[in-house]
């Protein structure tokens, strides 16, 4: 089954404008994300989806594939959906453009799980919060799920809980595509 990754990128981020083009260790955050996703061996193809000419120019500079999208998307997910409609992939991975440390092994594990278990339609990872300051941080998306690990909701606000454990979302989504 063809597995494609799409990295939605734009310059108008509300919390940190132009973050995709910020340089870290000599490369843009976007290039770091692309290279890590590209190194996941279960992913057949990687595209950057953007409407911003400056991002497209940067993508061309580091020789990545891209899909030019509609300018007025309200979310990265809608940008990925537009890009995915132009692809011939059974599974599409949405990797946020601000995840420069995304683990290629995590992407491989998620892709393998999605292929193995045909009942999964959407898959997204979470990680236990160990630093209690992250619970109050609106930049950290907290996740709530049921006993079967089905997501119930996500929030930037602290989540009231009884278990004493809080989880944060990692900016990756795998979706099974029916064309």
Task: Pin down the residues of each PLM region.
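Short aromatic/basic micro-patch
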Residues: 15, 101, 174
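Conserved donor-nucleotide/metal-binding helix-loop-beta segment in metal-dependent transferases, i.e.
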Residues: 105-130, 134
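Short phosphate-binding loop-to-helix
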Residues: 47, 53-97, 101-112
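Short, high-confidence coil segments that cap the C-terminus of an alpha-helix
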Residues: 43, 89, 118-120
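N-terminal glycine-rich phosphate-binding loop and ensuing alpha1 helix
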Residues: 2-49
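Short glycine/serine/threonine-enriched helix-capping/active-site loop
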Residues: 8, 123-125, 154
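Conserved small/polar residues in nucleotide/adenosyl-binding loops
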Residues: 177-179
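Anionic-ligand binding region
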Residues: 128-171
């Amino acid at each position: 089954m063809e597995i494609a990754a799409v990295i939605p990128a734009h310059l108008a981020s509300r919390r940190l404008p132009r973050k995709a083009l910020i340089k870290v260790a000599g490369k843009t955050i976007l290039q770091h994300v692309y290279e890590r996703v590209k190194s996941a061996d279960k992913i057949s193809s990687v595209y950057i989806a953007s409407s911003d000419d400056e991002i497209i120019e940067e993508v061309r500079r580091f020789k990545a594939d891209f899909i030019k999208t509609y300018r007025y998307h309200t979310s990265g997910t809608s940008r990925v959906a537009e890009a995915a409609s132009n692809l011939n992939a059974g599974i599409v991975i949405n990797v946020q453009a601000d995840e420069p440390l995304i683990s290629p092994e995590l992407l491989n594990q998620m892709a393998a799980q999605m292929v193995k278990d045909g009942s999964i339609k959407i898959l997204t990872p979470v990680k236990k919060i160990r630093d209690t300051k992250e619970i109050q941080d609106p930049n950290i998306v907290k996740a709530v799920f049921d006993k079967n690990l089905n997501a119930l909701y996500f929030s930037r606000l602290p989540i009231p809980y009884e278990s004493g454990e809080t989880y944060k979302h990692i900016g990756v989504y795998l979706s099974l595509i029916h064309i």
